[in-house]
């Protein structure tokens, strides 16, 4: 669990808050990546975060 994503260690969690946190992460994953070396925008075609997003979306459905 990572605090920067709104997840808090220990204790009970509200399921809606967890889903909201994962949906926020999914939005960040879909944003294009801007490399610092040049002015072009690169959209990563395969990312472990995309795999995680797909897994979480299948669990939410």
Curated annotation (Swiss-Prot):
Stimulates the secretion of gonadotropins; it stimulates the secretion of both luteinizing and follicle-stimulating hormones. The modification Pyrrolidone carboxylic acid is found at residue 1. Its main location: secreted. One of its GO terms (biological process) is regulation of follicle-stimulating hormone secretion. It is found in: Secreted. The record marks 3 as: Appears to be essential for biological activity. It comes from the Eukaryota. Coiled coil: none annotated. This is Progonadoliberin-1. One of its GO terms (molecular function) is gonadotropin hormone-releasing hormone activity. InterPro entries: GnRH, Gonadoliberin, Gonadoliberin_I_precursor. The modification Glycine amide is found at residue 10. One of its GO terms (cellular component) is extracellular space. Keywords: Amidation, Cleavage on pair of basic residues, Hormone, Pyrrolidone carboxylic acid, Secreted. It comes from Ovis aries (Sheep). Belongs to the GnRH family.
């Amino acid at each position: 669990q990572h605090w920067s994503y709104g997840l808090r260690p220990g204790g009970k969690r509200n399921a809606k808050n967890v889903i909201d946190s994962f949906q926020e992460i999914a939005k960040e994953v879909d944003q294009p990546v801007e490399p610092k070396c040049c002015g072009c925008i690169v959209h990563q075609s395969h990312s472990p975060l995309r795999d995680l997003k797909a897994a979480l979306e299948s669990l939410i459905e």
